[in-house]
């Protein structure tokens, strides 16, 4: 979708807050540990290029989801290491080697395919993924990893790192976390040829399990000022939420008792009341199930009434406000605040998803 600069709906991204959040985590982890900024999914909706440039002096590299995200950073002039966390099939390796993008290898099947499709891996930097219990991608045994490392090196690749990902690092019950940690430690200890970089710490592990950090961390959601657990665990230090979302009233009217609002006529006024229309809808990532939630106008919580439409939503107002009056959907308005986690709790989802669903139709202002 094209970014809509000619309407009042915008996301404001505080890059200084992101820099300070990363600095706060770095103070909390052991000295000498490398920091990778996770900027996949357009930096969780904050803008991958802008965030990466802002963090350039603070981090050692970046993590993305796929090759296209890596190339976007290279084209923007980012010259530090970029690690693709997902699997890149061997038919795309030429571009990864040319643009000096580090790839994740997660199986011996990948190695066999590479031997057929791109046997010369000279110039390719690799991190090996271990499935310690997440159940998505990765190898599960010392023998497999030893064979993979030997095979990759014989084809000319540099095996720089090895890593895993925890499924429950953001939960109070650490049983599964400890099982995964012990599995990973045992596997690493059994390797004949251990890669230089070992990393297992995502945002949650970095802040709640800092004693388990190896020699690199991957900082994602905490960089953007959000609690990885939502509301389940307390943060050990304060973070600044970096993104706010705002719009304006574009239509205000009074309706009478018995009048309905929105598709399906799901809202019926019980008395005369003022209704405001705001130009944001589910095409922007403000999902239909937000009916009944509130936004902030003039420091007051105003309920979303009627179904959220593709491009608009309607709110109940305490009085008639002029067109152009500010509407806050995420962030502060006259000492009142709506957080991304508040929205996630209402939707019965996670704060990550709320941010990632904000579409590129909403301009990001820095």
Curated annotation (Swiss-Prot):
CDD domains: PLPDE_III_AR. Its EC number is 5.1.1.1. GO terms for cellular component: cytosol. SMART domains: Ala_racemase_C. GO terms for molecular function: alanine racemase activity; pyridoxal phosphate binding. The keyword Protease does not apply. The modification N6-(pyridoxal phosphate)lysine is found at residue 40. Pathway: Amino-acid biosynthesis; D-alanine biosynthesis; D-alanine from L-alanine: step 1/1. Its cofactor is pyridoxal 5'-phosphate. InterPro entries: Ala_racemase, Ala_racemase/Decarboxylase_C, Ala_racemase_C, Ala_racemase_N, Ala_racemase_pyridoxalP-BS, PLP-binding_barrel. One of its GO terms (biological process) is D-alanine biosynthetic process. This is Alanine racemase. The lineage of its organism: Bacteria, Bacillati, Bacillota, Bacilli, Lactobacillales.
